């Protein structure tokens, strides 16, 4: 015959109370995780959709269109980083920043830094330049001007245009952006694409 809770030992009541508390905590934690997961997925889709499809399609027209757009540059750099060959785009970016220097006194130290990082024989991020261009750039270091890296930058741009840019257009780094449905799909493959897509463009927000 059931005597109700009053008939149970005190230890049983404490155990039941503890179990109820734990279940409540787990349910609350589960709800919180589901909310965060949903929120993160929404954020990733928003990031994917932040660039218009018209703009993304223009990136396939030329490398110049791609890297002149902040989000395009971020996506291309992420692709090169995945191939462990980001030194080319890093050099190109450094040259662009160098040409914006207004103070003549800052040209020489910045030029030497770029040269030592990308062009010298023992450069940590040595770019692939022919011997003539390398020697010409080396001579320019004697009296650095705003145009001292122009030839080297042009050669690296052409190299990226003929090689890595073409591979980028065939990669998921670009295809996931040009096809937004792959970013927000609920399928497992779509969810993976969403994560990858979100990692491409956060810095262009």
UniProtKB/Swiss-Prot annotation:
Palmitoylated on Cys-2 and/or Cys-12. Phosphorylated by cyclic GMP-dependent protein kinase. SMART domains: RGS. GO terms for molecular function: GTPase activity. CDD domains: RGS_RGS4. Keywords: Lipoprotein, Palmitate, Phosphoprotein, Signal transduction inhibitor. Residues 62-178 form the RGS domain. GO terms for biological process: negative regulation of signal transduction. A lipid is attached at residues 2, 12, 95 (S-palmitoyl cysteine). The keyword Cell membrane does not apply. PANTHER family: REGULATOR OF G PROTEIN SIGNALING, REGULATOR OF G-PROTEIN SIGNALING 4. Inhibits signal transduction by increasing the GTPase activity of G protein alpha subunits thereby driving them into their inactive GDP-bound form. Activity on G(z)-alpha is inhibited by phosphorylation of the G-protein. Activity on G(z)-alpha and G(i)-alpha-1 is inhibited by palmitoylation of the G-protein. This is Regulator of G-protein signaling 4. It comes from Pongo abelii (Sumatran orangutan).
